[in-house]
UniProtKB/Swiss-Prot annotation:
It catalyses: an acyl phosphate + sn-glycerol 3-phosphate = a 1-acyl-sn-glycero-3-phosphate + phosphate. One of its GO terms (cellular component) is plasma membrane. One of its GO terms (molecular function) is acyl-phosphate glycerol-3-phosphate acyltransferase activity. It is a multi-pass membrane protein. The keyword DNA repair does not apply. It comes from Helicobacter acinonychis (strain Sheeba). The gene is plsY. Pathway: Lipid metabolism; phospholipid metabolism. This is Glycerol-3-phosphate acyltransferase. Its EC number is 2.3.1.275.
């Protein structure tokens, strides 16, 4: 009993669970219900992220579709950032901050508030890692938005954006950057970001097949 109690009161366990719960806040679902009376989990792809929200609202001729989708994207991004910020604020070890980041991503994709359904997690991924690897993630964000703006294919932009940040972690740590944002100095491995990228690919398997077949839908 004491072992269980010690486990449940362990600061690292508490913040990992907190990261999961924060990441699990379904902003897309909540805002679509509040403002439009729609259950976004039962429409389109069933995802609660900005892409499915945008497609759903545009298909119904809603004039502020882009603004609502952008709001949801920002909220999903900032919840990941907030979870990691809290872990930094309370002085958690850098490797455990990565655990909190991963927990927030899993929370978004498998929300405890939606029977463990959710979105594909890209906004939350970018938000959660920006305080951990700011150089790599900010460049990844720019690539994500650029590809999305030019090609208007959300899934491709997501994969390329997260992929860019992942590739950069094999180069940026060897530059003259502060140890506090150097994944190799703090963790000793690039594994956390590589796992996140693999998870991104898994969540986009259907989209990848559609891309290869030339059937992936564009976001207008």
């Amino acid at each position: 009993m004491d072992g269980v109690l010690n486990f449940l009161t362990n600061i690292n366990v508490i913040f990992t669970l907190l990261g999961y719960l924060i990441g699990g806040i379904p902003f897309g679902y909540a805002l679509m219900k509040i403002f439009y009376g729609m259950d976004i989990t039962k429409i389109g792809s069933g995802g609660i992220g900005a892409t499915n929200v945008l497609r759903t609202l545009q298909s119904r001729g809603v004039s502020n579709a882009k603004q609502m989708a952008l709001l949801i994207l920002i909220l999903d991004l900032f919840k990941g950032m907030f979870a990691v910020f809290l872990s930094k604020l309370f002085g958690l070890d850098y490797s455990l901050q990565w655990m909190v980041a991963i927990a927030s991503i899993l929370g978004h994709c498998y929300s405890p508030f939606l029977n463990f359904n959710g979105g594909k997690g890209v906004s939350t991924i970018m938000g959660s890692v920006v305080l951990l690897i700011p150089i790599e993630s900010l460049i990844g964000l720019m690539v994500w938005f650029f590809v999305g703006k030019v090609l208007k294919i959300s899934s491709l932009a997501s994969i390329v954006g997260v992929g860019t940040a992942t590739i950069l972690i094999f180069f940026v740590p060897y530059m003259h950057i502060p140890d506090s944002v150097n994944i190799l100095k703090e963790v000793g491995t690039q594994t956390p970001m590589v796992l996140i990228f693999i998870f991104t690919l898994i969540k986009h398997v259907g989209n990848i097949f559609n891309l290869l077949a030339g059937k992936e839908k564009k976001v207008l």
